[in-house]
Amino acid sequence: SILEKMQRKHIPMEKMEEEIEDIAGIRIICQFEEDIDTVASIIRSRSDMTIKSEKNYLKHIKQSGYRSYHLIIYYTVDTINGPKRLQAEIQIRTMAMNFWATIEHSLQYKYKGEMPLHVAERLSNAADAIIALDREMSSVRDEIMDAQNSSQTQSNLVKDILLSIENLYKISNKREV
């Protein structure tokens, strides 16, 4: 895969480490789309890596329907020959986005990049459904959080009322003595 990419982009072997950004990589899977920004912010704040570039395929969706957030980073590792600065790609996406991307990647491989139009259209429709699914799951999460906050507020109110009753009871007992 790396050698194919080098041939396709006419990259000589001695330039591989500086010109191919995704030799190493990690994929971070989030439950909710809004978590992606949080994770990206945490990565940006790290002092042990430097951000080379960011690609926001959430706002700039690829024509295929691909959505994800990519950061290309520089990271220093210790080797037998001393410290070495490497490039790596960090992909951040939701579980639903990852499911779609995995299927799309398999189909691209199967069709060798020449996916039939009817399959590409179905993938595009599935990508739209993934967007709707991620939004719906975020909405459900918001409702659950609102319900939990409301429940906590009610619980605090009951505690306050019971404390007031207890204080009134103590005051009334002191007056009787």
List the predicted regions and their residue ranges.
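Intrinsically disordered, low-complexity acidic/polar and Pro/Ser/Thr-rich regulatory regions
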Residues: 136-177
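A structural signal for alpha-helix termini and helix-coil/disorder junctions
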Residues: 8, 12, 45, 49, ...
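Long beta-strand-rich cores associated with HINT superfamily self-processing modules
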Residues: 17, 29-139
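Proteins with a high burden of low-complexity, intrinsically disordered sequence enriched in S/T/G/P/A and R
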Residues: 1, 106, 112, 167-176
